[in-house]
Amino acid sequence: MATYLIGDVHGCYDELIALLQQVEFTPETDTLWLTGDLVARGPGSLDVLRYVKSLGDSVRLVLGNHDLHLLAVFAGISRNKPKDRLTPLLEAPDADELLNWLRRQPLLQVDEEKKLVMAHAGITPQWDLQTAKECARDVEAVLSSDSYPFFLDAMYGDMPNNWSPELSGLARLRFITNAFTRMRYCFPNGQLDMYSKASPENAPAPLKPWFAIPGPVSEAYSIAFGHWASLDGKGTPDGIYALDTGCCWGGKLTCLRWEDKQYFVQPSNRQMDMGEGEAINA
């Protein structure tokens, strides 16, 4: 009965299956945690969604920014970009079933017994766990409702970038979405910076990676996240696990077995595409 945490899959279906075979994942007894961004850029987004959905209660996932963008494309709000390679999914006979399932997935996973929290981009140091749970539920409720296209149309944007319990309406939902799915850097007070994509050693002062600023959640729980492929799983404090290692860019797909903290990797089937260097931070 093992728990396996895997970073951003981004449509890399073959690598996902190979990695699960490598660790001898057994859905009947094991649990798979996925950090989000199941889709886009890799060639197999349709197969990834079909497989993950088929796992039922054996999988715990969170939504990433690319998953939300897919939902916006599906709703007719955003443009289907060829580089995302989503057309086979959008044109599949079971697209409605898959994407209506996807929009009902959470932004946050918490295991109190393991003292483990997972979100796609991480947990802002401005939140305690109760606030994070409440905020996740706010967005999840809208996404699972019939009014979800209205939210998806309004979610794009970098402001507001500072948390306040007084935030309301679409501004509140946009901050929550950015914190859970797009965050990388914060100012020392925890305010989000949504612009810098430099590596931590080159980030302009006074910005720090969100995980370098102490917060109530990181002080009491381990946090697993994806999103930030250029970290390559390195440079985080103890108890913070960066699992996106750029499989869709020619890197690797990374798995952490929680019980003994052993890592497993599956090299990407893609050659490193230097032309997409900026997009590694997307």
UniProtKB/Swiss-Prot annotation:
Top-rank taxon: Bacteria
UniProt keyword list: Hydrolase
Catalytic activity: P(1),P(4)-bis(5'-adenosyl) tetraphosphate + H2O = 2 ADP + 2 H(+)
Stretches assigned to coiled coil: none
GO molecular function per UniProt: bis(5'-nucleosyl)-tetraphosphatase (symmetrical) activity
Enzyme Commission no: 3.6.1.41
HAMAP family: ApaH
Similarity comment: Belongs to the Ap4A hydrolase family.
Entry function: Hydrolyzes diadenosine 5',5'''-P1,P4-tetraphosphate to yield ADP.
Stated name of the protein: Bis(5'-nucleosyl)-tetraphosphatase, symmetrical
